[in-house]
């Protein structure tokens, strides 16, 4: 059966926190500008074609094979992990593997419990309901979903005022696939309804190289040896960023009439966008330089740091710092932000004797 995707136009609304700056960054894991989250030309349609996450793939394959042999819809699935790692793609793959339709919506798109009730009551037997950003569902919608996921029914209110009554509406068996970047924000009762929970991790360079090589073949880009590696190094362990950078390199190749892309072409193309070998962009470098040159390596408070780089404190904290901390360029301490030795070395600056020694931190 050919799968059907019904997408609400508001499905992929992004959180407001730091959204303006994040939406302009080439190395953002969230969609940039009008870039679609759903990219059919690059998205694999079967689990075997999904690159990376080998343990998760093995678990999910077993889970789906068992459901097919039992000839029943599988348990509800929760996909958790940072943005851009393939949660939406996996949801589409599950529906395709099961040969059932998929309905797509998101937490922000569901404003009232009635919105969700309308979707649930229209589901067919075996259909998949994919809810992106499920942690952002309104409380009333969450409570409605508890019952629907466990008992496969919704309670419909008939009438108004004191005479109103609740009539249970039985639903066919279906599968909810929830995606979240903040699993901790999900209420325990909702988490408990998911029979299968998968956590997606950032990709190592080797797996990103394979993904880039696959995407380049789909896009018709000839990459020479080492070019995929240069792209992978700058992609922050995130497939969405890797595919975005690959497209910008394709633009470079087209404009310069290149038949194939060399590693040096990747370096030149992405240097134009101020993306360096570690995947750091203009804002990342500005933050590190401010700490190192203006505050001698730190510690420095968040507000002072934000003022130095001309950004809102919230933007620096939520958009820039997570990657710098994850990659060991920055440390958050009770006294403030501190640049690590790796940051000094990356900037090509030798710390003087009065620089804050992060090795002495307790």
Curated annotation (Swiss-Prot):
Residues 204-274 are annotated as: Small ATPAse domain (RuvB-S). It catalyses: ATP + H2O = ADP + phosphate + H(+). ATP binds at residues 42-43, 84, 87-89, 150-152, 193, 203, 240. Residues 15-203 are annotated as: Large ATPase domain (RuvB-L). Keywords: ATP-binding, Cytoplasm, DNA damage, DNA recombination, DNA repair, DNA-binding, Hydrolase, Nucleotide-binding. CDD domains: AAA (cd00009). The RuvA-RuvB-RuvC complex processes Holliday junction (HJ) DNA during genetic recombination and DNA repair, while the RuvA-RuvB complex plays an important role in the rescue of blocked DNA replication forks via replication fork reversal (RFR). RuvA specifically binds to HJ cruciform DNA, conferring on it an open structure. The RuvB hexamer acts as an ATP-dependent pump, pulling dsDNA into and through the RuvAB complex. RuvB forms 2 homohexamers on either side of HJ DNA bound by 1 or 2 RuvA tetramers; 4 subunits per hexamer contact DNA at a time. PANTHER family: HOLLIDAY JUNCTION BRANCH MIGRATION COMPLEX SUBUNIT RUVB, PTHR42848. Homohexamer. Forms an RuvA(8)-RuvB(12)-Holliday junction (HJ) complex. HJ DNA is sandwiched between 2 RuvA tetramers; dsDNA enters through RuvA and exits via RuvB. An RuvB hexamer assembles on each DNA strand where it exits the tetramer. Each RuvB hexamer is contacted by two RuvA subunits (via domain III) on 2 adjacent RuvB subunits; this complex drives branch migration. In the full resolvosome a probable DNA-RuvA(4)-RuvB(12)-RuvC(2) complex forms which resolves the HJ. This is Holliday junction branch migration complex subunit RuvB. It comes from Bifidobacterium adolescentis (strain ATCC 15703 / DSM 20083 / NCTC 11814 / E194a).
């Amino acid at each position: 059966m050919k799968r059907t995707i019904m997408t609400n136009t508001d499905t992929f609304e992004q959180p407001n926190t730091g959204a303006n700056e994040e939406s302009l960054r080439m190395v953002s894991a969230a969609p940039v500008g009008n870039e679609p989250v759903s990219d059919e030309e690059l998205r694999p349609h079967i689990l075997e074609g999904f690159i990376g996450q080998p343990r998760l793939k093995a678990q999910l394959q077993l889970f789906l094979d068992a459901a097919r042999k039992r000839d029943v819809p599988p348990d509800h699935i929760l996909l958790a992990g940072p943005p851009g790692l393939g949660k939406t793609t996996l949801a589409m793959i599950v529906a395709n593997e099961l040969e059932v339709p998929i309905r797509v919506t998101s937490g922000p798109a569901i404003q009232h419990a009635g919105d969700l009730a309308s979707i649930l009551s229209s589901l067919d037997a075996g259909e998949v309901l994919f809810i992106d950003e499920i942690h952002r569902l309104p409380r009333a919608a969450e409570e409605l979903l508890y019952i629907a996921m466990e008992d496969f029914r919704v309670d419909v209110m008939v009438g108004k005022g004191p005479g109103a009554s609740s009539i249970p509406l039985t639903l066919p068996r279906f599968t909810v696939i929830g995606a979240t970047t903040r699993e901790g924000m999900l209420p325990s009762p909702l988490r408990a309804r998911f029979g299968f929970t998968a956590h997606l991790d950032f990709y190592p360079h080797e797996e990103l190289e394979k993904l880039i090589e696959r995407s380049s073949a789909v896009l018709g880009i000839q990459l020479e040896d080492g070019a995929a590696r240069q792209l992978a190094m700058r992609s922050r362990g995130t497939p969405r960023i890797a595919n975005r950078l690959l497209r910008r390199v394709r633009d470079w190749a087209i404009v310069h009439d290149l038949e194939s892309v060399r590693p040096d072409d990747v370096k030149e193309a992405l240097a134009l966008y101020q993306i360096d070998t570690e995947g750091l962009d203009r804002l990342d470098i500005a933050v590190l330089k401010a700490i190192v040159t203006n505050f001698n390596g730190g510690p420095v408070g968040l507000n002072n740091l934000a003022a130095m780089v001309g950004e809102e404190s919230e933007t620096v904290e939520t958009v820039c710092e997570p990657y710098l901390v994850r990659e060991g360029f920055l440390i958050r301490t009770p006294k403030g932000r501190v640049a690590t030795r790796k940051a000094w070395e990356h900037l090509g600056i030798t710390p003087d004797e009065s620089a804050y020694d992060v090795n002495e931190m307790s």
